[in-house]
Amino acid sequence: MEGNRDEAEKCVEIAREALNAGNREKAQRFLQKAEKLYPLPSARALLEIIMKNGSTAGNSPHCRKPSGSGDQSKPNCTKDSTSGSGEGGKGYTKDQVDGVLSINKCKNYYEVLGVTKDAGDEDLKKAYRKLALKFHPDKNHAPGATDAFKKIGNAYAVLSNPEKRKQYDLTGNEEQACNHQNNGRFNFHRGCEADITPEDLFNIFFGGGFPSGSVHSFSNGRAGYSQQHQHRHSGHEREEERGDGGFSVFIQLMPIIVLILVSLLSQLMVSNPPYSLYPRSGTGQTIKMQTENLGVVYYVNKDFKNEYKGMLLQKVEKSVEEDYVTNIRNNCWKERQQKTDMQYAAKVYRDDRLRRKADALSMDNCKELERLTSLYKGG
């Protein structure tokens, strides 16, 4: 069972990397796999948030600047650290400072998000999107911005979960929830924390935005989680991708393979007609013949007379005449269209030369069509 837990944790890590890269489908696939291996709370929490809010991922790409935050945080709260200077080392405005202080002074999660206690899912999503972008430590360098960002993430993660929201409402405020964490009813807070990290939640909403090489560590009560915005490919992931990649390539090539097979089969099944309206040395159809009814000329090979006699010959000659009439009719239509176009152009541009040229068109195919029509009527 412990072996399954290790594999499940690997799947969760791969899912988090996928979220950082904005690949929600891959993250969801690995989280579902982790759930089958071992029931990790973090996997369940991530999966629930993705299923509820994943459709928004990837719609709001953002560019992250390398963060140098290293603010000293409160016990059991967010710690955002890199090898650079602290949050105060970068520029920030008075409005950002006031906003951070306002968030950190809030006593309950409803105040944090600025919503009422009867707020629905859409209200929570709207409030979270607005605040998460405003207080993300890579955009807001005011002291305490990391704590505020974490608090906003925890607020949404708890209030968007019906069960956790119901139990949270029993405590009245955040501090009471923290004080009651040893009580079995409130152990879902894990020391005032949700089962999903603030950065994971942000990546689900914004499709792995703010890509960079910076590292953010968020403490979730009993254990910390470090995210590196770089591609870390494990052997487990590569093996999974190879399997999926091979199958997906096969699926993509399937229509082409089917098309080739159908083309080959049709060539094998459909034989060349025993005649041609024009001499074709490649097929040996060079012997000239003429239909008995309309006198249409066609060409056959040397074995034709031995193979086609009587009724068979009549069927062939009927097909010859039908093909010939169809060709003549099409060519006549083209001739008429050409003549009409030339006459119209001559009228528009008042060009007598073009008008005379249009009148001089021979219309050979139309004359032949008239001859064939008279033969049909006469027959």
Swiss-Prot record:
Gene3D superfamilies with a match to the protein in the record: DnaJ domain (1.10.287.110)
SUPFAM superfamilies, sorted: Chaperone J-domain
InterPro entries cross-referenced by the UniProt entry: DnaJ_domain (IPR001623), DnaJ_domain_CS (IPR018253), DnaJ_subfamily_B/C (IPR051100), DUF1977_DnaJ-like (IPR015399), J_dom_sf (IPR036869)
Lumenal-facing ranges: 266-379
Membrane-spanning segments: 245-265
Spans within the Cytoplasmic topological domain: 1-244
Keyword field contains Membrane: yes
Residue span(s) of domain J: 108-172
Disordered, as annotated region: 55-94, 219-241
Membrane topology reported for the UniProt record: Single-pass membrane protein
Example of a GO biological process term: protein-containing complex assembly
Keyword vocabulary terms for this entry: Chaperone, Endoplasmic reticulum, Host-virus interaction, Membrane, Nucleus, Transmembrane, Transmembrane helix
Gene Ontology cellular-component annotations: endoplasmic reticulum; endoplasmic reticulum membrane; membrane; nuclear membrane
Composition bias, Polar residues: 69-84
Subcellular localization, as worded in the UniProt entry: Endoplasmic reticulum membrane; Nucleus membrane
Family membership noted in the UniProt record: Belongs to the DnaJ family. DNAJB12/DNAJB14 subfamily.
Protein known as: DnaJ homolog subfamily B member 14
Organism from which the protein derives: Homo sapiens
Lineage: Eukaryota, Metazoa, Chordata, Craniata, Vertebrata
Gene name linked to the record: DNAJB14
